[in-house]
Amino acid sequence: MALFVFWREGAAAGRPAGQLHALLDGAAHIAPDRVTRGEAGGPAWRWHFVAYATRTHFYTPEAQVWQAPGQGACVIHGLIWRMRGTVPELLDAAAVAALLDRPGAMLPGDVMGEYAVVRLLPDGSLVAFSDRPGLHQLFHAADGAPVVANRASLAATVLDDAAPDPAGQRWLAAIGYRVGTATAYRAVRQLAQERVLRFAAEGMAIDAMADPIVRLDRPRGFHPALDPLLDEGIAQAQAAIRLGIPADGPVDLPITGGKDSRVVLALCLAAGLRDRLRLFTRGYAGHPDVVAGAGIAAALGLPHRREAPHGSDDAAVWSGRRFFDTVAAQAWQSDHMVGGWDLILGTRIAADTLISGHMGEVLKAYSKKPLPEGPLDPVAMVRLQAPFDPMGLLHPEARAAIEGELAVQMDEARAQGAREGDLPDLFYYRNRLPNWLGAIRAIKSFERQPVVPLGAPALLRLAFQLTPEERKHELLHWLIISRCAPVLLAQPFAFQSWDPALGPDAPYVAPVLPAAGAPPAFGNWQYSLNSNASIRAALAAEVAAHGDLALWRSINREALVDRLHHRRLDYFDGISMLGLMIAIVQERGLGRPVKIGAAESDGVPSVTLAPHDPPRLIGHLDGVEGAAKAVGFGGWAYAPDWPAAQVALEARVRGQSLGVGVAGNDRPDLVPHGVGDGRHGFSFAIPRSDLIDAARGAGEVEVVISPFDGAGELARVKVVP
């Protein structure tokens, strides 16, 4: 992986290259294995560049940067390869430079991967582009100044303009990620999908790539004439798998309860890898994905293990400091361009790789919900699967601007031949893919670089030759599994099954669903927004203290404070709130520069927010109930100034925490007494073994029930361990 930025003299606001290099080193979000600085010039031009490269599963740092006297330079980021028959051939920077050896040259059609490329030619012209879906993003100056980078803040640093762009910010609060090419910075734009950026003596040009993935002017629907394209896609996908695994030894493969990972498993089985596979699933014990994954492994006689996903096995309730520090670190690492819900945070530089089922969502429909009659409304389209301003925070003018951006995209797609049913899938491909998954790639690829067989160009082309209904029925998933590993067709999925519209051969298998009382299937630590009233109080104080943010031109500040007091956040609300927090962090300059792989990252100071009063808590311990292995505590707790919060409580002995419980049980008897909606009861247990250890031989021990992450106490009670 290699961060890079190229700029021509005159674009850097008069600052010399030496001064810029020091600033760029600080803006890079990684601790690189190798830094390469270079320049090239002619009588009328001079380019400068810097590349921050790390060792990957595929490349040494040196292999990702090429320069030669009189021949220019080339930097690659990601993974680039081409098909040689059925064998994948890796391309390094020198090989890519040789293919882009003259103005106007592009990579051959058999080149694949996930990558960003920049090539400086001997005549001073420059070309830059990324993979067709745009998963590895490129950025350029909004005014056409000769700057290109694969991290937006590097371009903003060269341009000496880090002012936020309200047009990009408001999307984070509306849906949790950006739409279109606006970035977090007003001076920087993202290169659109399937576009080529060129700089020559006459200035900047952005051209469309030839032979686009999405062609809507062809006959639609799967038929036997498309079998060769399907076979080509399967061959490309299996070549990608071979590229991403070692020559021998075990192969770790993720398996979930969904269809994407099952298609990848089918491809691996058909490629003869069965005896090398070691399946694993991320999730808490008993999560439907874990249950389904273990069942598939058992049916095939393959080993299976459970891994903790990001954040889900951590404490479900976070302290305010941990919450804000984590969000602020992600804001900085992600260039403030994606919401905080998915906890996209990198900690280490590593050369791991992973065969991923990502991109499979492009092969199927954005949503399985039926479309309304008539022309599709922009907001209704987004809401088929995702939030759109779920808390009603957008000012009318900002909402209208967002709807207008969506409407323009939709009308352009209709003009290209899109049906109404295509529009949600095109929205996903053209926006969520580069701007959400691309943001994940920009961080997590430095730890574990994914290989994505379902992103095979032939499969993507085939997906958009299907009808919208065929994608909704997940026809491609069915066809690939049927051809490669039909034994997998009848294994249960999590939350879903095969669509009966596939025909009588499609088995209906009851899906695996969450057990009663299971944790949320989507999200965990994020619900600290509901259970730690201190987080709400701190955020409300920060909003109240800074009324001059440009963000408030789009977001109703008073409505936001009201929601923090009175609205209990659900899944979509949380996505919106954590998107909004990223935008606030940017404007307030609160991003924590936690560099991926840097030894000093633990020493980065915590976020300093506006002062706030600790939330006032009332409540009562109604009773203590002893059982053979645990002692239970029950009662109610309520923060009157933050009635939507369902406060977390902590049981402590001599200051040591023995357990945390959330006052979220339904207690209708509390409502007549003014205790909110009554959903403020608590009941949690402490293992007797923990109480015995805490008692240190005493016959009884005093347990203090206190606010989690707060001062004071709710009750004290003596219990026998």
Per-region residue spans from a language model:
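Cysteine-centered catalytic environments shared across enzyme families
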Residues: 1-254, 259-308
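Active-site cores of enzymes that catalyze phosphoryl transfer or operate on phosphate-rich substrates
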Residues: 197, 256, 375-405
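Conserved adenosine/adenylate-binding substructure
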Residues: 112-117, 247-250, 316-368, 403-450
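Generic recognition of stable, solvent-exposed alpha-helical segments in well-folded globular domains
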Residues: 192, 228, 232, 236, ...
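Basic, ligand-binding patches in group-transfer machinery
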Residues: 600-721
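Adenosyl-5′-phosphate
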Residues: 9-11, 18, 35-44, 188, ...
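ATP-dependent adenylate-handling ligase core
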Residues: 285-344, 358-388, 465-468
